[in-house]
Amino acid sequence: MIPGEYKVKPGYIELNIGRATCSIIVENHGDRPIQVGSHYHFAEVNPALKFDRQKARGYRLNIAAGTAVRFEPGQKREVELVALSGARIVHGFRGDIMGELEANDE
């Protein structure tokens, strides 16, 4: 084996199979690039990103763990989101939820 070498099986790696997903259009209205990580609660991202935040509640980007999506100023793109799993308790981020998602859905 060569140091740093990867040995992977042929084919595709499927992520989040069977999980609820949705697609939304996101536009960066800011004057700086905005990068969003794979496990960030998407409804709470930077306010300069304009999209349907209610639709994004309880979802994150449907991308591989540890990766991110970058939105350049003025850029508009469609992204796929995947439902958060587990206990669906959200703390931190921008502080909009701070607890159970379903308890805050009023």
From Swiss-Prot:
Pfam families (UniProt xref): Urease_beta (PF00699)
Primary subcellular site in the record, as a coarse category: cytoplasm
Subcellular location: Cytoplasm
Source organism superkingdom: Bacteria
Pathway connected to this protein: Nitrogen metabolism; urea degradation; CO(2) and NH(3) from urea (urease route): step 1/1
GO biological process, one term: urea catabolic process
EC id: 3.5.1.5
Molecular-function annotations in GO: urease activity
Reaction catalyzed: urea + 2 H2O + H(+) = hydrogencarbonate + 2 NH4(+)
One term under GO cellular component: urease complex
Swiss-Prot/TrEMBL keywords: Cytoplasm, Hydrolase
Broad enzyme group: hydrolase
Subunit structure: Heterotrimer of UreA (gamma), UreB (beta) and UreC (alpha) subunits. Three heterotrimers associate to form the active enzyme.
HAMAP family recorded: Urease_beta (MF_01954)
Family: Belongs to the urease beta subunit family.
Name used for this protein in its record: Urease subunit beta
Originating organism: Escherichia coli O157:H7
